[in-house]
């Protein structure tokens, strides 16, 4: 299983490189990313969150939305954004136990390549749209806390630094 990179970490700030072609190595990575995401009880995971500088993310919103199957998105691009927005609470596997309310567009159209090198187009809304936007932010070096006020962002970063110190101490034992 892959290790999830915890914030703050500079690897989470890198704008990821596109993939020219999905090969068996990338398909194995995608499979391992799904295993890691499920183990952490997540609904999305981006390659930089496991230390990989590639424009790949996975989502599985399950029965919560119109998309019933897990999806891997490679080199995704949002091609249309509806003007209506909603505010919902978001979390992130790189920020365990930290949540914040964010405003995001309700509906998007995203084009991407799947794990079989097939071009895909998806129109999605609500929760799935939000998850895709969150993961797309990750591969662009943007974190969900970047959408918050400076004060809220600084509080979460301080708590994460403390959390990482505690984890490192327990790992040393």
Where are these regions (language model features)?
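Positively charged
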Residues: 1-173
């Amino acid at each position: 299983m892959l290790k999830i990179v915890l914030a703050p970490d500079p690897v989470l700030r890198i704008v990821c490189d596109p993939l020219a072609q999905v090969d068996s190595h990338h398909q194995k990575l995608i499979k391992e990313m799904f295993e890691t995401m499920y183990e952490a009880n997540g609904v999305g995971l981006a390659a930089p969150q496991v230390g990989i500088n590639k424009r790949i993310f996975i989502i599985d919103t399950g029965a919560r939305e119109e998309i019933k199957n897990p999806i891997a998105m490679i080199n995704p691009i949002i091609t249309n954004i509806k003007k209506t927005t909603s505010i919902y609470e978001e979390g992130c596997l790189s920020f365990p136990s930290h949540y914040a309310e964010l405003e995001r567009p309700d509906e998007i159209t995203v084009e991407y390549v799947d794990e079989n090198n097939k071009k895909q187009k998806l129109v999605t809304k609500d929760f799935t749209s939000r998850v895709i936007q969150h993961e797309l932010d990750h591969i662009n070096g943007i974190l969900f806390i970047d959408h918050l006020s400076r004060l809220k962002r600084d509080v979460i970063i301080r708590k994460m630094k403390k959390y990482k110190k505690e984890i490192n101490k327990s790992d040393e034992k």
